[in-house]
Amino acid sequence: MAHKKGVGSSKNGRESESKRLGVKIFGGQAAIAGNIIVRQRGTAHRPGDNVYAGKDHTLHARVDGLVKFTKKKDDKSYVSIEPFEA
């Protein structure tokens, strides 16, 4: 026999706020130095040429240019920036 009623509505209904992760500037799009390219947990995408990672693994553009996503032989995704011609 149950010793508690099966209601419990006040103990339910909690969920964490979404963290808005993901790619913010896609391949072929222009990025300005300092722009966020990818927000991520861990290193799903790794920094390539002219891209640096913040302490929370967010990838930022180091220079103005076009974003490029590539996969190398190790099957990992790399994000790089091809600078605009001066």
Curated annotation (Swiss-Prot):
- Entry-linked InterPro entries: Ribosomal_bL27 (IPR001684), Ribosomal_bL27_CS (IPR018261)
The record's section on Gene3D superfamilies has:
2.40.50.100
Q: Which GO terms describe its cellular component?
A: cytosolic large ribosomal subunit
Protein name as catalogued: Large ribosomal subunit protein bL27
Q: Where are the transmembrane segments?
A: none
Q: List the PANTHER family.
A: LARGE RIBOSOMAL SUBUNIT PROTEIN BL27M, RIBOSOMAL PROTEIN L27
UniProt key word Chloroplast:
no
- Family, similarity comment: Belongs to the bacterial ribosomal protein bL27 family.
Q: Which PROSITE patterns match?
A: RIBOSOMAL_L27
Where on the tree of life does the source sit, at the highest rank? Bacteria
Keywords for the protein's UniProt record, in alphabetical order? Ribonucleoprotein, Ribosomal protein
Q: Mention one GO biological process in which this protein takes part, according to its record.
A: translation
